[in-house]
């Protein structure tokens, strides 16, 4: 990406963050790339984390209606500001999917209640359910072969990475039942 494109993307990101904040959303990622005679604008948004919230609370994901509303807001803003210039563009707005790696504290916090595989330097990957996540680290509840559970704590300073595991057959109602 050229310096001009990078500066434009940064300006767009700053502008979009301004319209997302009142909607209690945060800009997770923005990419502007050529797509034939047009440009493709990919925007990832997610809910703003509640200040001082309970680190064991499950945070509901964005639903399709919310994403559709946000898409209209972003499209209107891009058109108002003429940020994309004269060239046509295609706008894609979504929330981070399960394939997006968990690398920042807010990623782990948003996935309380979900099954994840955690990788820490010089350790074997561990799969368990995030039961708590705060500013310092998170707790993973791991179920052993005989059904016994243990809790393992990780600090973000330890350069941990996570990946959400898809659970077939687990109803969304069972996630966070006791919250």
Give names to the regions the model predicted.
Residues 1-179:
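Short Lys/Arg-rich amphipathic alpha-helical segments
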